[in-house]
C-alpha cells in the first residue's frame, strides 16, 4: 500500500530523479483538498450500513433470483456473507480515498477476489451491480454540501467513483 506521497517518492527514486514540479503541484492540490477528502471518508463511514443495506436492497429488487430458494444470497448465512463482502469493499474504497491511491484497494481487497468468487460460484456480474449501487449511494451522500468543507468536489467525486468502478470491474 502506498499513499500518494510515498508513491511519488518511490517513482522519483526509481527514475533516479528529483521530484518534478508537476508531482509537487499534484501533491499540493491533494493537500489543499485534504479537508474535503476527510469529509468524504467521514460521510461514507458514518453511513456505511445504510449504503450497504440500500445497495443490497436495490440489487435484490432488480435480481430477485439471488434471494429465492437456490439463489446465491438465499439463506441468512449467504445473505450475511454478501453484505459482509459489500461492506469490506466499501471500507477499502474509503481507505483508497483517504490515501489518494488505489493500491490499498487493489492489494488488500481486489486481487484474487474474482477468482475466489468464481471458485465459490458467486455471480460476479451481480456483485459488480451491487458495487455500482454502492457507488451511486456513496457519491450522493459524499456530495451533499451541507455541513462539509465548501468548494468544488467534482475531482474528488470522480476519484471516488473510479475506485468503485475499479472494484466493480475486478469482480465482474
Swiss-Prot record:
Q: Which GO terms describe its biological process?
A: photosynthesis
Q: Which GO terms describe its cellular component?
A: phycobilisome; plasma membrane-derived thylakoid membrane
- Swiss-Prot/TrEMBL keywords: Antenna complex, Bile pigment, Chromophore, Electron transport, Membrane, Methylation, Photosynthesis, Phycobilisome, Thylakoid, Transport
> Which parts of the sequence carry N4-methylasparagine?
72
The subcellular location is: Cellular thylakoid membrane
Ligand binding ((2R,3E)-phycocyanobilin 1)? 82
UniProt similarity note: Belongs to the phycobiliprotein family.
Q: Provide the assembly information.
A: Heterodimer of an alpha and a beta subunit, which further assembles into trimers and the trimers into hexamers.
Q: What's its job? A: Light-harvesting photosynthetic bile pigment-protein from the phycobiliprotein complex (phycobilisome, PBS). Phycocyanin is the major phycobiliprotein in the PBS rod.
Q: What is this protein called?
A: C-phycocyanin-2 beta subunit
What species was this sequence derived from?
Answer: Microchaete diplosiphon (Fremyella diplosiphon)
